[in-house]
Structure formats: C-alpha cells, structure tokens
Amino acid sequence: MIKVLECEMSVIGALLCSDNDEALQTAFSRISPKAFSDESLQEIYKAIVKVWQETGKTDCVLILKALPEEYRARIPICMDLVPAPSLLPHYTAMLMDQQR
C-alpha cells in the first residue's frame, strides 16, 4: 500500500511542478479522480484539474485556495517526492499500470 500511495502522491507532485502543457494535457486525459485510492488525493487532483481548466496553469496558490484546510498540508509533501517535473509521463504510466 505504501508504494501505491507514494506513486499517487508523486503524480500529484509532478502535476503541481510541471509547466509542460503537453504532458499535463496527456496526464489529465488519462487520469480520473478514481485512479487515486486516497480520498484526499482525489480531492487535490480535482482541484488541480479545475484550476488548470480555468487558468491553463497548475498554480499552487489557486489550488491551495480551492482546497479545504485539511488537504493543504499534503501539497508540499507530494511536491517533495518529485525530483523533476519532467517525470510526469513516467508517474502517469505507473499510476495507470496500478489500475490494471
């Protein structure tokens, strides 16, 4: 379970750090909130998608404002798991593999 949670958190972290529009579009087209087993990560993912759809960016300040207080502490933890935003396609593929 820890590896699953770490993978899910890495996807969130990579989404938050990435500025690659193509990688973000691909990830958003492949991932649904149900791909996350953790409810807080589902809600964070929904907030990321909403902000991205409204602004074209994954702006952390706007995402934090869109989230209930209890989920906000997860954001920096997720971001710390990601050594490079360019790994978003890799983390997306890992998350999709877990769904099989």
Predicted ranges, named:
Residues 1-98:
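Noncatalytic partner-interaction/assembly domains of nucleic-acid and motor enzyme complexes
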